[in-house]
Amino acid sequence: MMSQADVLSGFDGFDIPDSPLGRPAVLPAVLAQMLIERLEEEKTIIVNQRLLDVDELHLQSLIMTAVQMGVWLLLTQGDQPAHGKACGLLSSEAALLSALSEGVHAGLIVSFRKPQEEQRKRLSLPASFFLGINLRDIAHVAQDERLIPYVLVRTERNAQLLGSLEQPSWDVKDAKDLLGQLEGLGFRSVLLSSPGDPASLADLLRWARNPYKGFQANTMGW
C-alpha cells in the first residue's frame, strides 16, 4: 500500500479496508499511521473495522486509537473470517453510537441494491458519513450529502479479480461517465478503487481534476 500511496498522492484521502474477504491482513490502523508519516499533505484517512471479529473492549480501544490519530472510522460487519469463528457481538448501530459519543468521525455502509425506502431508513442514522456500495443504477440511489459512492474501476489487469466479487465494477470509460452523473446529482465525494491497478486511478484522477471537465468532487483512493 505504501507504494500505491506515492502513485495516488493526488487524492484527497484514502480508505483502508480491514481483512478484505475475511483474509488476514495488516491492521488498518498500522497502515494509517504509515500513511500519515509518509504523506506530505494532510489527507482524510478512513480506517475500516470489521465488527464480526471483535468485542466491546476491542472497539473501545479502536475508538481511542482513532481519536489519537485523527482518522475516520468506517464500521462494517465484514465477510465471514477465513480463519477461526466470527464473534458477532456488536451491531453496526451500537458501534456507531459508541464512536460518535467520543467525537470520532464515524460512518456506516449503505447498499444501493436495497429499495430506496430501506436506504432512507439507513440514512436516518446519525452517522458522520455513509459509504454507498453496490452501485449499479443511479436511478436507485437515495440522496444524502453524507453519502460517498464506492466505484470499482475495472481494467485488463484486474478484470479477473473483480469478476469474482459480488460488487459491480466499471471500465475506465464508463467510470468517467458515472463520475459526471454523480456530480450532476450533487455528490461531493466518491471513493474510487482499482485493486491491482493503482495506475488506472491516477489516470482517472488526472481526468477528473482537468478544469475543462468541471468535476469538483473530492476523491479518495484505495
Question: Locations of the language-model features?
Answer:
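Active-site pocket-lining/capping segments in soluble small-molecule metabolic enzymes
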Residues: 1, 6-8, 74-81, 86-113, ...
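Conserved N-terminal beta1-alpha1 strand-loop-helix module at the mouth
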Residues: 1-29
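Non-catalytic positions within long, well-ordered alpha-helices that form the structural scaffold/packing
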Residues: 6-7, 64-67, 121-125, 183
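A structural motif
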Residues: 11, 68-71, 125-128, 187
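Conserved beta-strand positions in the central sheet of alpha/beta enzyme cores
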Residues: 15, 72-75, 128-132, 191
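Acidic-and-aromatic substrate-binding clefts and catalytic sites of carbohydrate-active enzymes
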Residues: 19-27, 51-57, 134-140, 198-199
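Flavin-dependent oxidoreductase catalytic cores
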Residues: 21-39, 43, 169-170, 207
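Glycine-rich anion/phosphate-binding loops
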Residues: 52-68
